[in-house]
Every structure is written in C-alpha cells, then in structure tokens.
C-alpha cells in the first residue's frame, strides 16, 4: 500500500487580505466567470504564476536542458490553447488570468451556446450533462485542451441530448435573438 502523499494546497493566498484594488479585481473576475469562491480564482492565479516563474527561469538559463524545457513549456501552453503555436517565452510573461479562465470548461460551455448563462453552464457540468470527447466531466474548472474543444457536447444519457428538450429550445431562441 505504501504511504499516501501528503495533501497540499494547490494555491497561494494573497499576502495581505484587505487590499481594496485586489478585492475589486477579484470580485469582477468571480462574477464574470461565475466562480464559486475566491479559492478557485487563487488556484488559477497560482497556475499562471508558476507558468510565468518557469518562463523567467528558462529565459535566464542556458544549455541543452533549458532548450528542452522551453519547448515543453510552450508545447504545454499551446496544447491548452492558452498560447498560439509558435509563441515565444516572452508571450508567456504577458499572459493574464483571463487567458487561463477562458480555457475553463465552464466558460467554453457557455461560449459554445450549450447554456444560457455561465452559471447554468456550471450547473450542467456539475450535474453530469456535459461530456468532452465522450467522457463526462463534472469539474467546471477543467482546463480544456485545444484538441478537445470541438468535443464539448451534451452527454448521451443527458435529457439535454434530445433536441426537443424545452430548455434547449429556450437556449436556441436566446441565441437566435442575440444573432439578430
């Protein structure tokens, strides 16, 4: 069986809890992307910090191993759809938290028009109505790979898979109204 790994926090909290500018910025992001709480935002901010930290370290590094790690970092960000193919390490340093949050499953379900609101997108995901390439994903914070983006659909067993479902008809009417 072995010893299980120790569970660690996957995020860093802000160093000072009451900075008004940061609180205002976080509140806007939580509302825009319908995050459950600030912890979800801090997890993605920590991810972004780690990408940027690695890029700064690799910009200063020389050698064969540094070249390999540069290519791996850029390839990872390109697979996630955060950066375009052929990007440079300087592009990693200019990433913002919005670039990460735009790749969440919750955001992409809303943008594809599978839900009326971003909050409804979260509910559909948590309730198991959304699948990615045939696999039901119940985590709204799942970062969708670029190649998986076209595979986001309603689940086969979901009532939403039926095109005559009343809620789907409402969603389609809303989309038609926005298109006009």
Curated annotation (Swiss-Prot):
Keywords: Ribonucleoprotein, Ribosomal protein, RNA-binding, rRNA-binding. It comes from the Archaea. Residues 103-174 form the S4 RNA-binding domain. GO terms for cellular component: small ribosomal subunit. Pfam families: S4 (PF01479). InterPro entries: Ribosomal_uS4, Ribosomal_uS4_arc, Ribosomal_uS4_CS, Ribosomal_uS4_euk/arc, Ribosomal_uS4_N, S4_RNA-bd, S4_RNA-bd_sf. CDD domains: S4. PANTHER family: 30S 40S RIBOSOMAL PROTEIN (PTHR11831), 40S RIBOSOMAL PROTEIN S9 (PTHR11831:SF5). Part of the 30S ribosomal subunit. Contacts protein S5. The interaction surface between S4 and S5 is involved in control of translational fidelity. Belongs to the universal ribosomal protein uS4 family. This is Small ribosomal subunit protein uS4.
């Amino acid at each position: 069986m072995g010893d299980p790994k120790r569970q660690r926090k996957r995020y860093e909290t802000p160093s000072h809890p009451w900075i008004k500018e940061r609180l205002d910025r976080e509140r806007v992001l939580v509302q825009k992307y319908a995050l459950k709480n600030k912890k979800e935002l801090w997890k993605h901010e920590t991810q972004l910090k780690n990408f940027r930290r690695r890029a700064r370290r690799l910009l200063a590094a020389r050698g064969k191993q540094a070249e390999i790690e540069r290519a791996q970092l850029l390839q990872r960000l390109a697979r996630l759809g955060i950066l375009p193919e052929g990007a440079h390490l300087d592009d990693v340093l200019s990433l913002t938290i919005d670039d990460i949050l735009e790749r969440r499953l919750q955001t992409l379900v809303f943008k594809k028009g599978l839900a009326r609101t971003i909050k409804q997108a979260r509910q559909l995901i948590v309730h198991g109505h959304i699948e990615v390439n045939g696999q039901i994903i119940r985590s709204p914070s799942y970062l969708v790979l670029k190649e998986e983006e076209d595979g986001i659909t309603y689940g086969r067993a979901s009532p939403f898979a039926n095109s005559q479902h009343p809620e789907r008809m409402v969603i389609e009417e809303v989309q038609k109204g926005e298109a006009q």
